[in-house]
Amino acid sequence: MKIILSLIVALSFSVFTIGQDSPLWLRYPAISPDGQTVLFEYKGDIWSVSSAGGTAVPLTLSESYEFAPVWSHDGKSIAFASDRYGNFDVFVMPAGGGEAKRLTFHSTREVPSSFTADDTAILFNGTRQDLATNAQFPTGGMSELYSVPVNGGRVSQVLTTPALDATVSSTGDKIIFHDYKGYESDWRKHHTSAVTRDVWIYDVKSQKYTQLSTFKGEDRNPVFDSNDNDFYYLSEQDGTFNVYKSSLGSPAKSAELTHFSKNPVRFLTRARNGTLAFSWNGELFTMKVGSEPTKLNIRIGADGRDSIEKITPVNGGFTEAQLAPNGKEFAFVFRGEIFVSSLDGKMVKRITNTPWQERSVSFSPDSRTLVYAAEKDNNWNIYTTAISRKEEAYFCVSTVLKEEPVVATPAEEFQPAFSPDGKSIAYLENRNTLKVYDLASKQSHTVLAAENNYSYADGDQYYSWAPDSKWLLVQFGPKERMFTPEVGLVAADGTGGLRNLTQSGYDDVSPKWVMDGKAMIWGSTREGALSQGGGSVSDDVFAMYFTKAAYDRSKLSKEEFALVKEQEDKDKKEADEKAKAAGGPSANASPSPKADDKDKKAINIDWNGLTERKARLTINTSAASDWILSKDGEKLFYLTSFEKGNDLWVTELRTHETKLFNKLGANNTSMELSPDGKFIFVVADGKAVKVDAESGKSEPINVNTEMVLNYSAEKAYIFDHAWRQFKEKLIFPDLNKVDWDSYHEAYKRFLPYINNNYDFAEM
């Protein structure tokens, strides 16, 4: 029995200690005052290991993220930052492990930098309140230095100016730190500018600041030597972050102690015995001054709690959504996967299940095919997924689907959309060229050349199919003013060139066909307010009418229009009676699909006087984000912000009466009108809402499902995606002589050792 029990204990211990030899992406090292122990952050927890290396022991094990450990001078306590209550707060705990005590309770990020000389308080950085005498710009990035008692209590401000990585001298009369002059990423390398960090010293008694470093690049992370006169810090003087030594008496003189290349040294700390500890290339090192750095061979005794696949709820967070032409379901994208849901949210079908991203999803006219872009195998291409079984009418309850590549070339192709007749697909090639792909011939042709656009971010180009599939409205950048977009018109067959419809010199954006192709509406800043620098800060919705008849009809007063409508209804009734008597279909009968296709008459544009046939539809300027017309063209619905967040507003175009239609209070909004015109499909802050087009009453579409998420595969994709974005879009074709491919391999090896978004974002 004793033998069996001993075996069970041994097996249990071996299971716990199954882990990783030589793990990577070890961050935020802190060497103990006696130089015997090194703390570090790994996978969101604080670990402890001998300064000689060996098996590391976790001091925290939680679902929250803990980092930035610092030691008390007596070596009995440690402080660290944790987000276990939402934002990052300062905690303190025994150095050997135990219960952590929360010391700060503010709503902003707060991170410890050191203990005071007498170990009675902890210094930390946070953004709370500047002194009235502080002349720096009051941005949230400009933190202050505070202290909090180790036993808890009132927080005191030490410095109103940013003082990062602040540590105190042994007597407590000096604080050494690096500054923060303006926004720049903490992890940017090799840059020189007016906002790079410098090392400073603050005399507590005289309250005097003295700048110690003057290198035009980065100097940061200073720590005192035991004599309180010399100090060590990290600098890019040789082009890569390395450890340097200088002194308060002669700060202009510095000596480089390490000579690492390509990758930066980070997180410098020092023990009382002079041992330095730091991180380089994802691993930990210690060094005695005068000796070479020694890598710590570390083994992580992990319990394998990181699951590769996780069940993730899908109940919001849609990055895009589109209503199906049948009006019965909608497609949406969540975490790069495509789903289709019924309009009540009760039936949801996951369409794609890949580690890469799918986006720009839209339906075919018959609602049986989805077209979208996918970044498969490190290249954006166009794909379709169709319902295979004829007896199945809806995606949300379909059982067999078929995916096929449509446009798959070495070029980047995305942002596809079916033509209304279903015969073609428009898409962007290499972000700036608008092309049309003919599904019958399987050939593509250009309708808007790349010289007419400049894409700054994916998704910033816009086009819209005409109802007759013969034209496309486009938002383009004229050569003279590339970043002041205009609205243009191009033929879907690529002939005739580009026509500038707006010619305003202001921002004209997001044109939409309305009134069965008789007009378009778009947003323009021509009547909007201007900022002091001259840029537009608000816009209006305008309409342009492609025929004189449509323009004249729009100008009728409410009373005049009522008379015209009365006569039209009378004429229609007489036509119905004649048709009925002759045995034919009435004017009100629902046409068959084929008849409906034939009834889509070609759009004939009256070019004579076209630019004069426009009207401002909104009664006052605002920050409108989207706009649609009712099916009869009598109401303008638009999303804009007059209060907190975007709301849905409506304007009666005959009377110009404008009112709040539905209170959304959302930050990110988009919408489209249902095919029958009875409701508005709104996406507000990642959730879908139905708004009745007559009453304005809203009904949330409560999607509540879940998906299996492979976090590791998703993370690997995002890494490749970000790397490719930089390579494809950097303005310098030669990437400024940087060997970008080598950096891909240098950093990709860290991916297996990252299990959270904080570490991933830093990497």
Predicted regions located by residue number:
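A short helix->beta-strand "capping" segment at the edge of beta-propeller domains
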Residues: 20-26, 54-56, 302-318, 399-405, ...
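A flexible loop/linker signature enriched in serine peptidases of the S9 family
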Residues: 20-23, 41-47, 55, 60-66, ...
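Short coil/turn segments that connect the beta-strands within blades of beta-propeller domains
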Residues: 34-36, 74-76, 118-120, 171-173, ...
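Conserved blade-ending motifs and adjacent loop-strand segments that build the rim/top face
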Residues: 255-269, 499-511, 625, 662-671
